[in-house]
């Protein structure tokens, strides 16, 4: 055993043994039945159980002290006959919440006890719910190779002088309770003391011993213990209970940690928090297989607690004799824990029906009955998480072919406690989302670079948009980016500098003068000389900037609006209007646009041009226009209004005026 002194080595060895578990449908662990009796794991299980027994025994002793202080008793009798022994009692106190040891065979007729669930009860109910102290584990192990009985004690203890249950100790209370109990299924409608016998032989079946589970001070109300079966392993989360025809027997709460390996060596389950034990008959290894009845699930109710639990029925492959069909049956069911408040409210109802109201959910008509000729090997199923609106699954096994009794009416419905589901951690953004976010930020930065800049157009070199006056460069009638309009030889920017356009390329002055391109340079359209400096192109021709001037005022028109006549003479706008603008027929002056405008406003009448201010009546000076009373009535090439025109006609118009028409 020295190799297990190291706690790390011990834990590592035990974790290696967990590879015998296989995945279940509900995500928990299922025991590999093929490896349950492997002898190479016996030493590991024994050492691990011994270690855990010491830890749990300390916790149970503390719980026992607290219960004894809260429940002072007038008289005490020896606990369970006072026949308790060292390590065996420690292991029994831990129950099946720890990996069980390979237990020795117990001779027929002798009863041994194992531990079951210890629920926490309120102080006022502790008097009627004593918890058994540590008992020795032991049963008939079908698959064990150990022979003689290692430890045994009488199944029945003598009753103490005090018959009041309030003054009995844990063991004596259940012993007296078992002696006063009738046989299961005989008279289910009698007093609540019909709960099954514990620690005593099955009535009418001598030679068979009944195994029971006693709770040993486990303070957690929902942390159950495991019972053990011959050569079988339990799946975590299922319990077993016993009941008569229509009498209801409470079932315990069963669960086990997923990291524990269970090797079950007992042939039947026993008492859990006062639940009567299931007797053992002849050893008939009937493997349990699930049979889908009523579409794989049957609904069972508790007549006292109003609890509904859907479950599936397990039936053995081996049929029993017909005379056993009316006998006791053995069931396995999953019972969900009720809250302490619900248990208090329903305590009176549960006691009237012969139930322990603190055991949670009890099923009516499905509580197991013992079969005197069959040994049922229950399989624990993994417990599913309970929600506010779901009932826990219920699994049951039938050791005979007897029909399941009908449901009993429920006086009330009990709402189960809701288990809050914690949401998993939120996943971070995916790779695609990160790329999309980066692209969006890039586009936003590019848009922010030109928030409200003016758009000039597309660059002829890179075909991209030109935003803002700082990037725009116009040359040879085309639009460039400032960075795109560069010398073809040295790549220097040519904005604001002299450049030369040769054979479709632009060069700076230095590269043009020292490269021999002057032989093919453009000539000025006006002077005819080579353009060695800056070039100015207008109207499809090349000019020196100094040669491009107005023919009237000789002003340089580089960068200034200009116009040409039909002979391609260049004028500034002012001189163009002076020379080529139409003349007013009244005053003889050219009609020029007003100051600050390039548009000319004139009046055309009788195929003549007039200033707006010159178009009026020559006699009275009335401004003429298209309005009524202001219309023009010309006479002998003179402008008159209608009244002046009539006066002129009355004086005797000349023959030429007869042909005048009104305009």
Swiss-Prot record:
It comes from Rattus norvegicus (Rat). Residues 457-518, 522-582, 583-651 form the LIM zinc-binding domain. The lineage of its organism: Eukaryota, Metazoa, Chordata, Craniata, Vertebrata. The modification Phosphoserine is found at residues 139, 227, 233, 268, 291, 303-304, 408. Pfam families: LIM. Residues 180-251 are annotated as: Interaction with EGLN1/PHD2. Keywords: Cell junction, Cytoplasm, LIM domain, Metal-binding, Nucleus, Phosphoprotein, Repeat, Repressor, RNA-mediated gene silencing, Transcription, Transcription regulation, Tumor suppressor, Zinc. GO terms for biological process: cell migration; cytoskeleton organization; miRNA-mediated gene silencing by inhibition of translation; miRNA-mediated post-transcriptional gene silencing; negative regulation of canonical Wnt signaling pathway; negative regulation of DNA-templated transcription; negative regulation of hippo signaling; negative regulation of osteoblast differentiation. Residues 74-99, 117-158, 230-253, 267-297, 335-416 are annotated as: Disordered. Interacts with SQSTM1 and RB1. Interacts with EIF4E, AGO1, AGO2, DCP2, DDX6, LATS1, LATS2, EGLN1/PHD2, EGLN2/PHD1 and EGLN3/PHD3. Interacts (via LIM zinc-binding 2) with VHL. Found in a complex composed of LIMD1, VHL, EGLN1/PHD2, ELOB and CUL2. Found in a complex with TRAF6, PRKCZ and SQSTM1. Interacts (via LIM domains) with TRAF6. Interacts (via LIM domains) with SNAI1 (via SNAG domain), SNAI2/SLUG (via SNAG domain) and SCRT1 (via SNAG domain). This is LIM domain-containing protein 1. SMART domains: LIM (SM00132). InterPro entries: Ajuba-like, Ajuba-like_LIM1, Ajuba-like_LIM2, Ajuba-like_LIM3, Znf_LIM. Phosphorylated during mitosis. GO terms for molecular function: metal ion binding; transcription corepressor activity. Residues 138-153, 230-239, 267-296, 335-351, 364-376 have a biased composition (Polar residues).
């Amino acid at each position: 055993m020295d190799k297990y002194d190291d706690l790390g080595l011990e834990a590592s060895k035990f974790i290696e043994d967990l590879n015998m578990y296989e995945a279940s449908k509900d995500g928990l662990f299922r025991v590999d039945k093929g490896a349950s009796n492997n002898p190479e794991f016996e030493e590991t299980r024994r050492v691990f159980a011994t270690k855990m027994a010491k830890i749990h025994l300390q916790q149970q002793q503390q719980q026992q002290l607290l219960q004894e202080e809260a429940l002072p008793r007038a008289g005490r009798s020896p606990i369970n006959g006072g026949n308790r022994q060292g390590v065996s009692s420690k292991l029994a106190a831990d129950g099946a919440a720890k990996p069980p040891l390979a237990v020795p065979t117990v001779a027929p007729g002798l009863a041994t006890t194992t531990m079951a669930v210890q629920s926490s009860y309120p102080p006022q109910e502790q008097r009627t719910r004593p918890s058994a102290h540590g008992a020795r584990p032991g049963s008939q192990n079908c698959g064990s190779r150990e022979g003689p009985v290692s430890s045994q004690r009488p199944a029945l203890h003598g009753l103490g002088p005090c018959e009041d249950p309030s003054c009995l100790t844990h063991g004596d209370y259940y012993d007296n309770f078992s002696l006063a109990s009738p046989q299961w299924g005989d008279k289910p409608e009698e007093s609540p003391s019909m709960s099954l016998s514990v620690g005593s032989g099955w009535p009418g079946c001598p030679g068979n011993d009944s195994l029971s589970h006693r709770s040993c001070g486990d303070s957690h109300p929902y942390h159950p213990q495991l019972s053990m079966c011959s050569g079988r392993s339990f799946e975590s989360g299922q319990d077993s209970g016993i009941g008569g025809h229509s009498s209801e027997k409470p079932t315990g709460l069963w669960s086990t940690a997923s990291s524990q390996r269970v090797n079950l060596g007992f042939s039947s389950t026993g008492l859990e928090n006062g639940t009567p034990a299931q007797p053992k008959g002849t050893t008939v290894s009937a493997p349990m297989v699930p049979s889908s009845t009523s579409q794989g699930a049957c609904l069972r109710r508790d007549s006292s607690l109003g609890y509904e639990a859907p479950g599936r029925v397990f039936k053995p492959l081996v049929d029993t004799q017909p005379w056993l069909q009316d006998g006791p049956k053995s069931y396995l069911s999953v019972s969900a824990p009720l809250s302490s408040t619900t248990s208090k409210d329903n305590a009176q109802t549960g006691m009237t029906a012969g139930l322990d109201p603190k055991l949670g959910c009890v099923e009516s008509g499905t509580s197991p009955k013992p079969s005197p000729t069959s040994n049922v090997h229950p399989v624990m199923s993994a417990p599913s998480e309970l929600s506010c609106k779901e009932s826990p699954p219920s699994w049951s096994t039938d050791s005979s072919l007897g029909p399941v009794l009908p449901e009993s009416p429920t006086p009330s419905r009990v709402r189960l406690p809701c288990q809050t589901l914690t949401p998993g951690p939120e996943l971070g953004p995916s790779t695609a989302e990160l790329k999309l976010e980066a692209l969006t930020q890039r586009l936003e930065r590019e848009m922010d670079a030109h928030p409200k800049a003016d758009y000039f157009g597309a660059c002829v070199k890179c075909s991209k948009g030109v935003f803002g006056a700082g990037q725009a460069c116009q040359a040879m009638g085309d639009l460039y980016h400032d960075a795109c309009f560069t010398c073809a030889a040295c790549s220097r920017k040519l904005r604001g500098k002299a450049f030369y356009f040769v054979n479709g390329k632009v060069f700076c002055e230095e590269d043009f003068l020292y490269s021999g391109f002057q032989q093919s340079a453009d000539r000025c359209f006006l002077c005819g000389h080579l353009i060695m400096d800056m070039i100015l192109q207008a109207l499809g021709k090349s000019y020196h900037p100094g040669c491009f001037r107005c023919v009237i005022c000789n002003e340089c028109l580089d960068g200034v609006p200009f116009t040409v006549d039909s002979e391609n003479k260049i004028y500034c706008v002012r001189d163009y209007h002076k020379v080529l603008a139409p003349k007013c027929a009244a005053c003889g002056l050219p009609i020029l646009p007003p100051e600050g405008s390039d548009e000319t406003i004139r009046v055309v009448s009788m195929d003549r041009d007039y200033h707006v201010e010159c178009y009026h009546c020559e006699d009275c000076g009335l401004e003429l226009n298209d309005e009524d009373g202001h219309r023009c009535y010309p006479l002998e090439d003179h402008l008159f209004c209608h009244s002046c025109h009539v006066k002129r006609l009355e004086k005797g118009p000349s023959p030429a005026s007869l042909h005048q028409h009104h305009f």
